[in-house]
């Protein structure tokens, strides 16, 4: 498998990759899985499945990565499947699948594959993949609209959540004091603050905040995360006259996520470009009423409104009303969230792998999976 980031990484793609590798390694026929991560934002620590070979000597260096990939190709024993965890790595993954003579599976997350790739070679190779795994129906539809890949080759595998790690808890008192949130009504969004992620909806929440204050004098907007777009958002909050109602936490450790979710009365992310949105699952698992967009993959994370409230991010009144409606809901994990549990994810992935492998007469047994992301 060729992948961008996984063990030690932040964000939804890294989380998906970790779950994907664990689920593949639990397949009864998987003797070994080899993963080539491209980057790691943190040190690669922690336990890995016994049958996972996680190649780390080429992290964060393009030339060393290419060398490691080439060395891996030359030393391949019999493998049965090549998985490409990000469309940017498709040329490498395709080369590996051709070399080994095995099927190639591409994983699609979100906007990275909603339109033709800037690399024309990638667009040509896309037509040659044997299967595609998409985290949502939205991403599958957007990908199919330009790629020409047939629907029977495109499988849906939504993200999953650890329902033991993320669970409801009372508000964390030290964090309440640190961020001066005692006796406040807290709206929360968690995500990277970068210009390429402006689709997540930070601006939309800021723009309705003055109107919410008229109804909720103690409301505060908690923005969890960091990035170069932070100064722009701070300036926008000032220009809207709500700077004193917006708290920027900066980057938080993964170990503190649950504690930060506990601070929220509503989790709100009215996005336009989410392929799925793992943060929705995390918030709901922690029992936080959740507001998402009906225009992107967020609606699938909320099971089309079964688990939370859907709004149109282009309609500020709708966003405001969605937040107000969510504040009327009682905290607690919604029924039906176990649809996104890891065991359910594992079963879905095993079924997809069995179908992909059985479709290829030369790949009846999974002896080795090469993962490229």
Name each model-derived stretch:
Residues 138, 160:
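Carbohydrate-associated surface elements
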Residues 289-292:
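Short hydrophobic beta-strand element within catalytic cores of glycosyltransferases
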Residues 84-90:
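Short His-centered aromatic/hydrophobic patch
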Residues 231-252:
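Nucleotide-activated donor-binding/catalytic signature segment of Leloir-type glycosyltransferases, i.e.
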Residues 272:
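Aromatic "clamp/platform" in nucleotide-sugar-dependent glycosyltransferases that forms part
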